[in-house]
């Protein structure tokens, strides 16, 4: 996985987290939860991409 792709996914997750924190501060818990889920999904995508690169596509997700 190229470094620029890693940086892109990290920044994308960071933006979701920052937006979620602002939503939570303003009392919009539902929107905050949605944004935290998106951030989590982005981080899972990043982790899975790195895992595939290291171990190949034969690894199991635990």
Indicate where each model-derived feature is located.
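Short, charge-rich amphipathic interface segments used for partner binding and complex assembly
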Residues: 11-62
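Short, charge/polar-rich alpha-helical segments
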Residues: 1-10
């Amino acid at each position: 996985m190229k470094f620029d792709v890693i940086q892109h996914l990290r920044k994308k997750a960071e933006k979701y987290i920052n937006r979620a924190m602002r939503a939570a501060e303003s009392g919009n818990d539902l929107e905050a939860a949605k944004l935290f889920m998106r951030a989590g999904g982005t981080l899972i995508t990043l982790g899975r991409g790195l895992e595939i690169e290291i171990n190949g596509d034969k690894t199991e997700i635990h």
